Amino acid sequence: MSIADIRTDYTQAKLSELDTDPDPVAQFAKWFGEALRAEVPEPNAMSVSTVAANGRPSSRILLIKDFDQRGFTWFTNYESRKGQELAQNPHAALLFHWIPLEREVRIEGRVERVSSAESEQYFQSRPVKSRLSALASSQSHPVADRTALEAQYAKVEAQYGEHPPRPEHWGGYRLKPDYIEFWQGRASRLHDRIVYSLDKEGKWQRHRLQP
């Protein structure tokens, strides 16, 4: 079988305007809850896409840690490639892909750092070894080899033990959405796409897109 012959026909569900909540965050909460109940592997995993000042895009998988009316929140190293790109261009796109449910959610908007207090609270809730890794790794920067990386970790572990502090370059981002699209796979590639976009008055407008 060639790659071109690999395909799946989606038949599980449908999505109409009447099925969706007027509030896209509430609609996301509904779908996220259904992904949890369906035991979708890592339902909180999302692709985060950023764009550098020269227009070159990059994407990576991260885990969302919170969402509410303020936006969608995750935590990372501010000195990483994504952190540097967000400093240059504070807009990003998120993508959740729940394969067992044949669903996707696309979210676009402006990104801001969360408060130091919020970053600190989440950092202290992480497992100790994850906190040590945040100190040991200069994310997205070159390292000689795995041995050198593990040596950096061992040094940090010896220094801080069970109480590693949050580095200043580590914290949270929150994306304030202005565009959210809910995609439900359908048969014959005639998929359902319901989009919410903010109008000039800051109100959500809902409409359907052709697949």
UniProtKB/Swiss-Prot annotation:
Coiled-coil ranges (or none): none
Name of a matching Pfam family: PNP_phzG_C
UniProt KW keywords: Flavoprotein, FMN, Oxidoreductase, Pyridoxine biosynthesis
Binding site for substrate: R7, T8, D9, Y10, K65, Y122, R126, S130, R189, L190, H191
Pathway: Cofactor metabolism; pyridoxal 5'-phosphate salvage; pyridoxal 5'-phosphate from pyridoxamine 5'-phosphate: step 1/1; Cofactor metabolism; pyridoxal 5'-phosphate salvage; pyridoxal 5'-phosphate from pyridoxine 5'-phosphate: step 1/1
Top-level taxon of the source organism: Bacteria
MF terms (GO), sorted A to Z: FMN binding; pyridoxamine phosphate oxidase activity
InterPro entries per the UniProt record, alphabetical: Pyridox_Oxase, Pyridox_Oxase_CS, Pyridox_Oxase_N, Pyridoxamine_oxidase_dimer_C, Split_barrel_FMN-bd
Cofactor binding description: Binds 1 FMN per subunit.
The protein's Enzyme Commission number: 1.4.3.5
Residues involved in FMN binding: R60, I61, L62, L63, I64, K65, F75, T76, R81, K82, Q139, S140, W183, R193
Family: Belongs to the pyridoxamine 5'-phosphate oxidase family.
Function: Catalyzes the oxidation of either pyridoxine 5'-phosphate (PNP) or pyridoxamine 5'-phosphate (PMP) into pyridoxal 5'-phosphate (PLP).
UniProt xrefs under HAMAP family: PdxH
Subunit text: Homodimer.
Protein's recorded name: Pyridoxine/pyridoxamine 5'-phosphate oxidase
